[in-house]
Each structure stands twice: as structure tokens, then as C-alpha cells.
């Protein structure tokens, strides 16, 4: 089978992680398949070369652009692919071969008020067109399957739940390595941690409000992954008015998953306050690194994390502050969460994700 994969979002956060890990497993066990990977100019050469069953094809189609429909359809036709996979909710409408599309979430539709005017309508339109065109629709969780059914009107008999996986890099790191990394990054030795984007639906305002309510003796610094925010950023202003600006630190840009694993391993508690998630990869990665997790129960988080995390509604900062305090003070509860988290995280592998995806490819070729 000659499989075309749209990899234009290779650098885009969680979707990029999905594409990269899926292709890594596919390339490692080609099983007679060939892969045509459609990439933007800046990503050419980023895939394994020697002995790889993957062929790179440059496309100039902007992500979520109108032109992507005919440019990608033409590229797929010229590459003679037997099946086309879009790893996000756009699909070239003129595509002639069987197609599979992955819908990671419909947050742009569910929380349209958090995005620029018209973004929600556009997202709904292109996602609905994509899932109607595709023979098989992949989703990360049962939560997203229900969203696809309710919001996009797709019968669930064409939808397959394919959970994401965790990279083998995410393991508990030795204390000496963690200490060295934290010193290099000028980060505190004990901290709460959040990893991910800072979009409004991530609900970081809840963490700021919870920090404000913590007793000073329990007010560990909060480390956010990525670069520092600008002083004028609404969250920076909120932290300033709450009197907790000095408690917030930033990891800076992380070079690879190994550094992220060190950041997870050093945290006293990982916190995930999201209003919605299609899966919830960062808290699962934190679990794999031996860090206890306090998470929102919204979206797919309850489904993904199960009983291995403390789950709370994403709305009451006082309740979050009390839970953060309790998890710092109660060593038995912490150890229990660590054990459960390590066990839970072992159930999610990219090999399983790839296997279920390949089964969906075969089903799509057989007519869906």
C-alpha cells in the first residue's frame, strides 16, 4: 500500500507530536508499505533518510488555506497514493483516493468565543466537510467521538477511537540529572508544573487564582513550559494583581523530549486546569515520569487519566488550592498517585496507536 500523509503541521504542538511518532513507528516496521509525506519547505529533510520507506514531497499549501484543497489533491494524485491520511480536521475535497482523517478535538467549535471572530464557524465547516469526505474518522478519545457525532453529525459507525501514545523518553530521571538541568535553567528545586499552550481554554487563570489562595508556606513556584510571557499579557496582568508574579517561572524553549522529561521529573505536582481536552497527553507524560497529577475532569481528561489523578471541576480556585496543599502534605497519597500514574501511563504506546491506525487504513481501503 502506498500511503500519503499530510505532515504540514509537523511543528505544531500536539499534532506535530502525533505525526512524528506515528511516522517513526511506521518507518520502523514498513511491512511492505510505502509512505509519501507531504511537507512544507522548512520541514524537508526532517524525516529519517537512509533505508526509509518514506518519500518527501514539498507542498506550498498553507495550513487551513483554501488553496490546500487543490494543491494537496494534485500532489496526492501525482504521487499515486492508494490512501490519504490527514492528521487534523482538514481534507482536500477533490481527493480521489480513499481517505482517513483524524479529529483531535473540536475546541475551536465548542469554545468559539475564545478565538478570533469566525474561527468557530470556519472550523465547523472544514471539519464537517472533511469527516463527510473521509471513509474512516479517527479520534483520540470517546469524548471526541461524541463531539464528532453531536457537532458534525457523523454516524459513529465510521469513527474509530485511537488513543495517543507516550514516547519512551518519558521515564523517571535520576535526581542528579534533574538537579543539574534545573540549575542550568535557573528553575526552583521544587515547583508546580504546567506544560502546553496558554490559550484561553487551557484555563491558566485558575492556576493563578489558586496560587493566590495558597498559604504562603505551601505556595511553591509555578513553572510554565516555554518562554516568558510579555508584561502586557492578560495572564501576566492577572498574576501581578493577584500578587503572585514572583511565583511564576518559565522553562524557556525545550530542545527535545529528554529535557521535557527532566522538567516533569523535577515537579512536585503536575497541574492541568483545562476547560476541554481531546486527550490530555502532558499529564500522562508527567505520570510516566513519576510525578503526581492534579487535573481538571473536563473533556477527555477523566477518560485518559482514570483514577491515576486527582480530578476536579475546572472552576473553583479555592478547591484547587486546597487540593494542591493536601497533595504536598500527604506523602502517602502522593506515593499512591505516583504508583497509579506509572501503571496508567504504561498502557499508552505509539506502537499501539500505529497498529490501530494501520487497521483503520485497511478498513478504509476495503470501503469503510
Where are these regions (language model features)?
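Carbohydrate transferase catalytic cores enriched for Leloir-type hexosyltransferases
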Residues: 1-368
